[in-house]
Amino acid sequence: MNKRPLLLCLGLWVACTLSKPTEKKDRVHHDSQLSDKVHDDAQNFDYDHDAFLGAEDAKTFDQLTPEESKERLGMIVGKIDLDNDGYVTEGELTAWIKKAQKKYVYDNVERQWQEFDLSQDGLVSWDEYRNVTYGTYLDDQDPDNSFNYKQMMIRDERRFKMADKDGDLVATKEEFTAFLHPEEFDYMKDIVVLETMEDIDKNGDGLIDLEEYIGDMYNHDGDANEPEWVKTEREQFMEFRDKNHDGKMDKEETKDWILPSDYDHSEAESRHLVYESDHNQDGKLTREEIVDKYDLFVGSQATDFGEALVRHDEF
């Protein structure tokens, strides 16, 4: 039996549950920056390239001639225009940027897909996932082992059913991606919140009190004095996390904590790209308007000199 999938699950569990006593565990799912480059169009469009293509694929376009960049960009426009009406809206551009930024997620799913799709039908059923991940562990458990594989499987099945939109217990690649990376999908946010609350709620009342909140982040382990950040977290809980000041966090308060709806970098970047490229100011972009501003969207050797990088043909 292949033990790698279960070891991956256990590895993630251990990483989430074990930490140094004074080390803060962060459960917040942050909206990541689109690029580590400075966003200053007066200097260059490197930030925009990373946002539109993803950092790795932006390097590819740096090695193309202007003509090649325009040709490939034109092909990409067809993928962004989801309703095929000949226009790219801010919403479609936002969706594309989010997808480009999630490329690492999809790459991770691709690496695992063949291992779980045992029947090679382009789908992964719950039975396939269960058999590959758990297999004989469910039948041959050490009673002295405190880790409950059956409970872990029940939790996985619940998440699988949530990701499986049509309820047939068979996941498409997109549904399987939502199962493996629920924090990346809006319709999976409730399960992320539920699993987090189950992890932290030790007394089983369905809520998170102050001591449970702190206990999840910090293990006293005989420390005489709490680190300063622990005191700060106590204040954060009482003043901001517990919005109704009843001493506990409910589902909505927990959601606001771990899935903050702050600044959306993808939406901001799509507005910026439309503003800079929309010649007739109708609020949407044609293929011609985008290709005309190819240096803003993707760049080329003519706009980005320097790095000697390996060229590939992903797009």
Swiss-Prot record:
Ca(2+) 6 binds at residues 278, 280, 282, 284, 289. Ca(2+) 1 binds at residues 81, 83, 85, 87, 92. Ca(2+) 3 binds at residues 164, 166, 168, 175. It is found in: Endoplasmic reticulum membrane; Golgi apparatus; Secreted; Melanosome. Ca(2+) 2 binds at residues 117, 119, 121, 128. The keyword Nucleotidyltransferase does not apply. One of its GO terms (molecular function) is calcium ion binding. It comes from the Eukaryota. Residues 1-19 form the signal peptide. Its main location: endoplasmic reticulum. One of its GO terms (cellular component) is sarcoplasmic reticulum lumen. Residues 68-103, 104-139, 151-186, 188-223, 229-264, 265-300 form the EF-hand domain. Ca(2+) 4 binds at residues 201, 203, 205, 212. A motif (Prevents secretion from ER) lies at residues 312-315. Keywords: Calcium, Endoplasmic reticulum, Glycoprotein, Golgi apparatus, Membrane, Metal-binding, Repeat, Sarcoplasmic reticulum, Secreted, Signal. The keyword Membrane applies. Ca(2+) 5 binds at residues 242, 244, 246, 248, 253. It holds the Pfam family EF-hand_8. Glycans are attached at residue 131. Involved in regulation of vitamin K-dependent carboxylation of multiple N-terminal glutamate residues. Seems to inhibit gamma-carboxylase ggcx. Binds 7 calcium ions with a low affinity. Belongs to the CREC family. PANTHER family: CALUMENIN (PTHR10827:SF76), RETICULOCALBIN (PTHR10827). Interacts with ggcx. This is Calumenin. It comes from Xenopus laevis (African clawed frog).
